[in-house]
Amino acid sequence: MSGAEGTRDGASPTGGSALAAYTTLRLGGPAAGFVVAEDAETLADAVREADAAGSRLLVLGGGSNLVVADEGFDGHVVRIATRGLRFDSVGDGLVQLTAEAGEDWDAVVAETVRQGLGGLECLSGIPGLTGATPVQNVGAYGVEVSELLLSVDLLDRRTGNVRTVRAEDLGLVYRGSVLKHSDQAVVLRVRFLLRDGGRSAPVRYAELARTLDAEPGSRVDVAEAREAVLALRRGKGMVLDPADHDTWSAGSFFTNPIVEAADLSAVLSRIGAKVGPDQRVPQYPASDGRTKLSAAWLIERAGFGKGHPGPGGRARLSTKHTLALTNRGEATTADLLSLAREVRDGVLAQFGVSLAPEPVLVDCAL
Protein backbone atom coordinates (compact mmCIF):
# COMPACT_ATOMS: atom_id res chain seq x y z
CA MET A 1 0.00 0.00 0.00
CA SER A 2 1.40 3.38 -0.90
CA GLY A 3 1.93 6.05 1.71
CA ALA A 4 0.20 9.37 2.13
CA GLU A 5 0.30 11.57 -0.92
CA GLY A 6 1.39 15.18 -0.58
CA THR A 7 -1.15 17.95 -0.99
CA ARG A 8 -0.68 20.84 -3.43
CA ASP A 9 1.68 22.46 -0.92
CA GLY A 10 3.53 19.23 -0.20
CA ALA A 11 1.91 18.55 3.18
CA SER A 12 0.10 15.38 4.18
CA PRO A 13 -3.67 15.72 4.69
CA THR A 14 -3.37 14.03 8.10
CA GLY A 15 -2.65 15.62 11.44
CA GLY A 16 -2.95 19.39 11.16
CA SER A 17 -3.28 19.61 7.38
CA ALA A 18 -6.52 19.49 5.45
CA LEU A 19 -8.44 17.52 2.88
CA ALA A 20 -9.24 20.89 1.30
CA ALA A 21 -6.41 20.33 -1.19
CA TYR A 22 -8.31 17.33 -2.56
CA THR A 23 -11.72 18.93 -3.08
CA THR A 24 -12.69 21.37 -5.82
CA LEU A 25 -14.32 23.56 -3.17
CA ARG A 26 -10.93 23.81 -1.40
CA LEU A 27 -12.74 23.07 1.87
CA GLY A 28 -12.41 20.39 4.54
CA GLY A 29 -10.35 19.55 7.60
CA PRO A 30 -7.75 16.80 8.19
CA ALA A 31 -8.10 13.03 7.96
CA ALA A 32 -6.96 10.56 10.60
CA GLY A 33 -5.28 8.44 7.93
CA PHE A 34 -4.63 8.77 4.20
CA VAL A 35 -3.34 6.36 1.54
CA VAL A 36 -3.16 6.47 -2.24
CA ALA A 37 -4.20 3.45 -4.32
CA GLU A 38 -2.57 3.39 -7.76
CA ASP A 39 -4.00 0.06 -8.92
CA ALA A 40 -7.23 -1.83 -8.35
CA GLU A 41 -5.60 -4.48 -6.16
CA THR A 42 -4.10 -1.86 -3.84
CA LEU A 43 -7.43 -0.05 -3.72
CA ALA A 44 -9.30 -3.21 -2.77
CA ASP A 45 -6.67 -4.15 -0.18
CA ALA A 46 -6.76 -0.67 1.40
CA VAL A 47 -10.53 -0.84 1.76
CA ARG A 48 -10.39 -4.37 3.18
CA GLU A 49 -7.73 -3.35 5.72
CA ALA A 50 -9.74 -0.35 6.90
CA ASP A 51 -12.85 -2.49 7.22
CA ALA A 52 -10.98 -5.21 9.11
CA ALA A 53 -9.68 -2.59 11.54
CA GLY A 54 -13.17 -1.22 12.06
CA SER A 55 -12.11 2.22 10.82
CA ARG A 56 -14.44 4.72 9.24
CA LEU A 57 -13.63 4.94 5.54
CA LEU A 58 -13.88 7.68 2.93
CA VAL A 59 -13.04 6.68 -0.63
CA LEU A 60 -11.86 9.86 -2.34
CA GLY A 61 -11.97 10.41 -6.07
CA GLY A 62 -11.62 13.80 -7.70
CA GLY A 63 -13.28 15.60 -4.81
CA SER A 64 -15.56 17.46 -7.20
CA ASN A 65 -18.81 16.36 -5.58
CA LEU A 66 -17.74 16.44 -1.95
CA VAL A 67 -18.32 18.77 0.98
CA VAL A 68 -16.08 17.90 3.95
CA ALA A 69 -16.61 19.29 7.44
CA ASP A 70 -14.19 21.90 8.77
CA GLU A 71 -13.33 19.43 11.55
CA GLY A 72 -12.25 16.92 8.92
CA PHE A 73 -12.81 13.16 8.88
CA ASP A 74 -11.88 10.97 11.85
CA GLY A 75 -11.28 7.88 9.75
CA HIS A 76 -9.15 6.62 6.91
CA VAL A 77 -9.21 8.18 3.46
CA VAL A 78 -8.28 6.07 0.44
CA ARG A 79 -7.60 8.20 -2.60
CA ILE A 80 -8.25 6.48 -5.92
CA ALA A 81 -5.38 6.95 -8.39
CA THR A 82 -5.87 3.89 -10.62
CA ARG A 83 -5.23 4.29 -14.35
CA GLY A 84 -6.05 2.40 -17.52
CA LEU A 85 -8.25 2.57 -20.64
CA ARG A 86 -9.17 -0.20 -23.04
CA PHE A 87 -11.21 -0.02 -26.26
CA ASP A 88 -12.73 -3.19 -27.74
CA SER A 89 -14.80 -3.35 -30.92
CA VAL A 90 -17.95 -5.41 -30.36
CA GLY A 91 -19.36 -5.20 -33.90
CA ASP A 92 -22.11 -3.20 -35.62
CA GLY A 93 -20.08 -0.01 -35.23
CA LEU A 94 -20.05 -0.27 -31.44
CA VAL A 95 -17.04 -0.08 -29.13
CA GLN A 96 -16.78 -1.07 -25.48
CA LEU A 97 -14.71 1.26 -23.33
CA THR A 98 -13.30 -0.07 -20.06
CA ALA A 99 -11.90 2.60 -17.74
CA GLU A 100 -10.28 2.28 -14.33
CA ALA A 101 -12.04 4.24 -11.60
CA GLY A 102 -9.14 6.65 -11.09
CA GLU A 103 -9.04 7.95 -14.65
CA ASP A 104 -9.78 11.67 -14.93
CA TRP A 105 -13.26 11.87 -16.40
CA ASP A 106 -12.73 14.69 -18.87
CA ALA A 107 -9.52 13.07 -20.12
CA VAL A 108 -11.53 9.91 -20.80
CA VAL A 109 -14.15 11.88 -22.72
CA ALA A 110 -11.42 13.68 -24.68
CA GLU A 111 -9.86 10.35 -25.67
CA THR A 112 -13.19 8.95 -26.88
CA VAL A 113 -13.66 12.06 -29.01
CA ARG A 114 -10.10 11.77 -30.35
CA GLN A 115 -10.93 8.22 -31.44
CA GLY A 116 -14.15 9.35 -33.12
CA LEU A 117 -16.46 7.59 -30.67
CA GLY A 118 -19.83 9.15 -29.97
CA GLY A 119 -21.82 9.11 -26.75
CA LEU A 120 -19.90 10.84 -23.96
CA GLU A 121 -19.15 14.19 -25.61
CA CYS A 122 -21.99 16.06 -23.88
CA LEU A 123 -20.40 15.09 -20.56
CA SER A 124 -17.22 17.03 -21.41
CA GLY A 125 -15.70 19.31 -18.82
CA ILE A 126 -17.24 17.62 -15.80
CA PRO A 127 -14.58 17.45 -13.07
CA GLY A 128 -13.85 14.30 -11.12
CA LEU A 129 -12.90 10.69 -11.72
CA THR A 130 -14.54 8.05 -13.86
CA GLY A 131 -15.51 5.81 -10.95
CA ALA A 132 -17.86 8.46 -9.61
CA THR A 133 -19.91 8.78 -12.78
CA PRO A 134 -22.22 5.78 -12.22
CA VAL A 135 -22.55 6.61 -8.52
CA GLN A 136 -24.07 10.00 -9.33
CA ASN A 137 -25.47 8.96 -12.71
CA VAL A 138 -23.68 12.03 -14.01
CA GLY A 139 -25.54 13.96 -16.65
CA ALA A 140 -25.37 17.18 -18.64
CA TYR A 141 -26.74 18.72 -21.82
CA GLY A 142 -29.31 16.00 -22.40
CA VAL A 143 -27.14 12.92 -21.77
CA GLU A 144 -26.80 10.74 -18.67
CA VAL A 145 -24.25 8.03 -17.88
CA SER A 146 -27.11 5.53 -17.52
CA GLU A 147 -27.70 5.68 -21.29
CA LEU A 148 -24.18 4.45 -22.10
CA LEU A 149 -23.14 2.39 -19.08
CA LEU A 150 -22.74 -1.37 -19.53
CA SER A 151 -21.42 -2.53 -16.17
CA VAL A 152 -19.14 -1.77 -13.24
CA ASP A 153 -16.68 -3.87 -11.26
CA LEU A 154 -17.34 -3.37 -7.55
CA LEU A 155 -15.58 -4.33 -4.36
CA ASP A 156 -18.36 -5.60 -2.11
CA ARG A 157 -17.35 -4.46 1.37
CA ARG A 158 -19.69 -6.96 3.03
CA THR A 159 -17.88 -9.96 1.54
CA GLY A 160 -14.54 -8.49 0.45
CA ASN A 161 -15.12 -9.91 -3.03
CA VAL A 162 -15.00 -8.18 -6.42
CA ARG A 163 -18.03 -8.64 -8.64
CA THR A 164 -19.35 -7.28 -11.93
CA VAL A 165 -22.76 -5.61 -11.80
CA ARG A 166 -24.81 -4.73 -14.87
CA ALA A 167 -26.00 -1.16 -15.33
CA GLU A 168 -29.65 -2.20 -15.07
CA ASP A 169 -28.99 -3.56 -11.57
CA LEU A 170 -27.57 -0.29 -10.21
CA GLY A 171 -30.88 1.50 -9.70
CA LEU A 172 -29.78 4.41 -11.87
CA VAL A 173 -32.08 7.42 -11.50
CA TYR A 174 -31.74 11.18 -11.94
CA ARG A 175 -28.42 12.08 -10.28
CA GLY A 176 -28.34 8.92 -8.24
CA SER A 177 -28.02 5.15 -7.94
CA VAL A 178 -28.03 2.48 -5.27
CA LEU A 179 -24.29 3.17 -4.95
CA LYS A 180 -24.89 6.78 -3.90
CA HIS A 181 -27.04 5.82 -0.96
CA SER A 182 -24.88 2.99 0.39
CA ASP A 183 -21.23 2.74 1.39
CA GLN A 184 -21.15 -1.03 0.95
CA ALA A 185 -19.45 -1.04 -2.46
CA VAL A 186 -16.47 0.67 -4.08
CA VAL A 187 -16.27 1.14 -7.86
CA LEU A 188 -13.05 -0.30 -9.32
CA ARG A 189 -13.72 0.08 -13.06
CA VAL A 190 -16.48 1.09 -15.44
CA ARG A 191 -17.58 -0.05 -18.91
CA PHE A 192 -19.41 2.02 -21.52
CA LEU A 193 -20.83 1.22 -24.96
CA LEU A 194 -20.01 3.88 -27.56
CA ARG A 195 -20.67 4.31 -31.28
CA ASP A 196 -17.91 4.55 -33.87
CA GLY A 197 -18.10 6.89 -36.85
CA GLY A 198 -17.32 10.35 -35.51
CA ARG A 199 -20.90 11.47 -34.87
CA SER A 200 -22.31 12.62 -31.57
CA ALA A 201 -25.23 11.28 -29.62
CA PRO A 202 -28.50 12.95 -30.70
CA VAL A 203 -28.43 16.61 -29.61
CA ARG A 204 -31.40 16.95 -27.25
CA TYR A 205 -30.59 19.99 -25.15
CA ALA A 206 -32.02 23.18 -26.67
CA GLU A 207 -29.16 25.47 -25.59
CA LEU A 208 -26.59 23.10 -27.08
CA ALA A 209 -28.58 22.72 -30.30
CA ARG A 210 -28.68 26.52 -30.70
CA THR A 211 -24.94 26.77 -30.05
CA LEU A 212 -24.25 24.12 -32.69
CA ASP A 213 -26.89 25.52 -35.07
CA ALA A 214 -28.27 21.99 -35.21
CA GLU A 215 -31.76 20.57 -35.29
CA PRO A 216 -32.81 18.99 -31.98
CA GLY A 217 -32.33 15.24 -32.24
CA SER A 218 -29.69 15.48 -34.95
CA ARG A 219 -26.14 14.16 -34.71
CA VAL A 220 -23.13 16.40 -35.28
CA ASP A 221 -19.38 16.00 -35.47
CA VAL A 222 -18.31 14.61 -32.11
CA ALA A 223 -15.41 17.05 -31.71
CA GLU A 224 -17.65 20.04 -32.48
CA ALA A 225 -20.13 18.85 -29.87
CA ARG A 226 -17.39 18.58 -27.25
CA GLU A 227 -16.06 22.07 -27.96
CA ALA A 228 -19.55 23.55 -27.81
CA VAL A 229 -20.22 21.89 -24.45
CA LEU A 230 -16.90 23.10 -23.06
CA ALA A 231 -17.66 26.65 -24.21
CA LEU A 232 -21.07 26.58 -22.54
CA ARG A 233 -19.61 25.19 -19.32
CA ARG A 234 -16.82 27.79 -19.25
CA GLY A 235 -19.41 30.52 -19.61
CA LYS A 236 -21.08 29.21 -16.45
CA GLY A 237 -17.86 28.74 -14.48
CA MET A 238 -18.22 24.97 -14.70
CA VAL A 239 -14.74 24.15 -16.05
CA LEU A 240 -12.06 24.10 -13.35
CA ASP A 241 -9.72 27.09 -13.35
CA PRO A 242 -7.61 27.74 -10.21
CA ALA A 243 -7.57 31.47 -10.98
CA ASP A 244 -11.38 31.71 -11.19
CA HIS A 245 -13.16 31.50 -7.84
CA ASP A 246 -16.41 30.80 -9.67
CA THR A 247 -14.98 27.32 -10.29
CA TRP A 248 -14.13 26.74 -6.61
CA SER A 249 -17.35 24.80 -6.25
CA ALA A 250 -18.89 21.35 -6.24
CA GLY A 251 -20.64 22.07 -9.52
CA SER A 252 -24.40 22.23 -9.26
CA PHE A 253 -25.08 22.25 -5.53
CA PHE A 254 -28.80 21.44 -5.77
CA THR A 255 -30.52 18.92 -7.98
CA ASN A 256 -33.45 20.01 -10.11
CA PRO A 257 -36.57 19.22 -8.06
CA ILE A 258 -38.95 16.59 -9.40
CA VAL A 259 -42.65 17.12 -8.72
CA GLU A 260 -45.26 14.38 -8.57
CA ALA A 261 -48.04 14.62 -11.14
CA ALA A 262 -50.68 15.02 -8.43
CA ASP A 263 -48.83 18.01 -6.96
CA LEU A 264 -47.82 19.82 -10.14
CA SER A 265 -50.86 22.06 -10.57
CA ALA A 266 -50.67 23.37 -7.01
CA VAL A 267 -46.92 23.95 -7.24
CA LEU A 268 -47.22 25.84 -10.52
CA SER A 269 -50.08 27.92 -9.14
CA ARG A 270 -48.01 28.93 -6.13
CA ILE A 271 -45.04 29.81 -8.31
CA GLY A 272 -47.29 31.81 -10.64
CA ALA A 273 -48.73 33.74 -7.72
CA LYS A 274 -45.22 34.83 -6.76
CA VAL A 275 -43.63 35.56 -10.14
CA GLY A 276 -46.70 36.46 -12.17
CA PRO A 277 -48.95 34.34 -14.37
CA ASP A 278 -47.23 35.43 -17.58
CA GLN A 279 -43.84 33.99 -16.64
CA ARG A 280 -43.20 30.58 -18.16
CA VAL A 281 -41.97 28.10 -15.57
CA PRO A 282 -39.28 25.85 -17.11
CA GLN A 283 -40.40 22.25 -16.79
CA TYR A 284 -39.27 18.98 -18.30
CA PRO A 285 -40.76 15.49 -18.35
CA ALA A 286 -39.35 13.06 -15.78
CA SER A 287 -40.03 9.38 -15.13
CA ASP A 288 -43.39 8.00 -13.99
CA GLY A 289 -45.36 11.01 -15.17
CA ARG A 290 -43.48 13.41 -12.93
CA THR A 291 -42.11 16.83 -13.90
CA LYS A 292 -38.64 18.27 -13.38
CA LEU A 293 -38.33 21.96 -12.54
CA SER A 294 -35.24 24.15 -12.88
CA ALA A 295 -33.50 24.69 -9.55
CA ALA A 296 -31.49 27.61 -10.97
CA TRP A 297 -34.66 29.36 -12.18
CA LEU A 298 -36.35 28.91 -8.80
CA ILE A 299 -33.28 30.18 -6.94
CA GLU A 300 -33.14 33.33 -9.04
CA ARG A 301 -36.89 33.97 -8.76
CA ALA A 302 -36.67 33.52 -4.98
CA GLY A 303 -34.35 36.52 -4.87
CA PHE A 304 -30.92 34.91 -4.97
CA GLY A 305 -29.13 36.35 -7.98
CA LYS A 306 -25.70 35.55 -9.35
CA GLY A 307 -23.00 36.45 -6.83
CA HIS A 308 -25.37 36.51 -3.82
CA PRO A 309 -24.81 37.80 -1.13
CA GLY A 310 -22.43 40.14 -2.93
CA PRO A 311 -18.85 41.37 -2.54
CA GLY A 312 -17.34 40.47 0.80
CA GLY A 313 -19.16 37.18 1.13
CA ARG A 314 -16.66 34.40 1.82
CA ALA A 315 -19.10 31.92 0.25
CA ARG A 316 -21.21 33.20 -2.63
CA LEU A 317 -23.34 31.99 -5.48
CA SER A 318 -21.24 31.92 -8.63
CA THR A 319 -21.27 35.18 -10.56
CA LYS A 320 -21.91 33.10 -13.67
CA HIS A 321 -24.43 30.47 -12.54
CA THR A 322 -26.79 30.54 -9.56
CA LEU A 323 -26.72 26.78 -9.07
CA ALA A 324 -23.06 26.76 -8.01
CA LEU A 325 -22.09 27.71 -4.45
CA THR A 326 -18.51 28.91 -4.39
CA ASN A 327 -15.59 29.51 -2.05
CA ARG A 328 -14.19 32.98 -2.73
CA GLY A 329 -10.84 32.02 -1.23
CA GLU A 330 -11.28 32.30 2.53
CA ALA A 331 -14.54 30.44 3.14
CA THR A 332 -15.10 27.60 5.57
CA THR A 333 -17.44 24.68 5.12
CA ALA A 334 -19.66 26.32 7.73
CA ASP A 335 -19.85 29.43 5.54
CA LEU A 336 -20.84 27.36 2.52
CA LEU A 337 -23.51 25.40 4.38
CA SER A 338 -24.95 28.60 5.83
CA LEU A 339 -25.38 29.95 2.31
CA ALA A 340 -26.87 26.65 1.14
CA ARG A 341 -29.43 26.74 3.95
CA GLU A 342 -30.34 30.33 3.13
CA VAL A 343 -31.00 29.45 -0.50
CA ARG A 344 -32.81 26.20 0.26
CA ASP A 345 -35.05 27.79 2.89
CA GLY A 346 -35.74 30.82 0.70
CA VAL A 347 -36.93 28.71 -2.22
CA LEU A 348 -39.10 26.61 0.10
CA ALA A 349 -40.65 29.71 1.69
CA GLN A 350 -41.38 31.34 -1.67
CA PHE A 351 -42.56 28.39 -3.73
CA GLY A 352 -43.08 25.41 -1.43
CA VAL A 353 -40.45 23.46 -3.38
CA SER A 354 -37.69 21.59 -1.52
CA LEU A 355 -34.20 21.63 -2.99
CA ALA A 356 -31.93 18.67 -2.25
CA PRO A 357 -28.13 18.90 -2.26
CA GLU A 358 -26.28 17.04 -5.00
CA PRO A 359 -22.81 16.73 -3.39
CA VAL A 360 -21.96 14.10 -0.79
CA LEU A 361 -21.77 15.74 2.65
CA VAL A 362 -19.01 14.27 4.85
CA ASP A 363 -19.57 14.72 8.60
CA CYS A 364 -21.70 17.81 7.95
CA ALA A 365 -25.33 18.46 7.06
CA LEU A 366 -27.74 21.11 5.84
Curated annotation (Swiss-Prot):
Major location (coarse): cytoplasm
Chain ranges of the FAD-binding PCMH-type domain: 27-197
Active site annotation, chain numbering: 175, 252 (proton donor), 358
GO terms of molecular function: FAD binding; UDP-N-acetylmuramate dehydrogenase activity
InterPro entries in the record: FAD-bd_PCMH, FAD-bd_PCMH-like_sf, FAD-bd_PCMH_sub1, FAD-bd_PCMH_sub2, MurB, MurB_C, MurB_C_sf, Oxid_FAD_bind_N
Enzyme Commission number, as recorded: 1.3.1.98
Key words, A-Z: Cell cycle, Cell division, Cell shape, Cell wall biogenesis/degradation, Cytoplasm, FAD, Flavoprotein, NADP, Oxidoreductase, Peptidoglycan synthesis
One GO location term (cellular component): cytosol
Subcellular location: Cytoplasm
Annotated coiled-coil segments of the chain: none
Catalytic activity: UDP-N-acetyl-alpha-D-muramate + NADP(+) = UDP-N-acetyl-3-O-(1-carboxyvinyl)-alpha-D-glucosamine + NADPH + H(+)
Pathway(s) where this gene product acts: Cell wall biogenesis; peptidoglycan biosynthesis
Cofactor: FAD
UniProt xrefs under Pfam families: FAD_binding_4, MurB_C
Class of enzymatic activity (EC top level): oxidoreductase
GO BP: cell division; cell wall organization; peptidoglycan biosynthetic process; regulation of cell shape
Tagged with keyword rRNA-binding: no
PROSITE patterns: FAD_PCMH
Annotated function: Cell wall formation.
Family: Belongs to the MurB family.
PANTHER family according to UniProt: UDP-N-ACETYLENOLPYRUVOYLGLUCOSAMINE REDUCTASE
Name the UniProt record assigns to this protein: UDP-N-acetylenolpyruvoylglucosamine reductase
Native source species: Saccharopolyspora erythraea (strain ATCC 11635 / DSM 40517 / JCM 4748 / NBRC 13426 / NCIMB 8594 / NRRL 2338)
Gene that encodes the chain: murB
